[in-house]
Design a protein with these regions (language model features):
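HIT superfamily nucleotide-processing domains
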Residues: 1-108
């Protein structure tokens, strides 16, 4: 698998996803192989390696606004939510992405 699943598969349209919310620069969708009963991924539509390499403050604000909107909906519907991003060796796909999830982990 490529180092950037999100550009190579999701944004290219090769892997269809269930869109949750989309803006001009950000896409939120249901994870293709969820770890939690509710598992939504939020990504920028351009390649950004990680949170540490994001230099565009406007894009960062747009990403956080989408994460906040998704998280608020998850909390409203499920009573709680987690928001996380991985860095370094914890980051499987080298494309900045946030996970918004709820419930007990269903796979490891």
């Amino acid at each position: 698998m490529s180092e950037d699943f999100y550009c190579d598969q999701v944004l290219s349209g090769k892997t269809p996803v269930g869109k949750v919310l989309e803006t001009e620069n950000v896409l939120a969708f249901h994870h293709t192989r969820p770890f939690w009963p509710v598992h939504i991924v939020v990504i920028p539509k351009i390649h950004v390696g990680s949170l540490l390499t994001l230099d565009d403050n406007e894009l960062l604000i747009e990403l956080i606004e989408v994460v906040k909107k998704i998280a608020a909906t998850v909390v409203e519907e499920h009573g709680a939510a987690r928001v996380l991003t991985n860095l370094g060796e914890y980051q499987d796909s080298k494309h900045l992405h946030f996970h918004v999830n709820a419930g007990d982990q269903i796979r490891g």
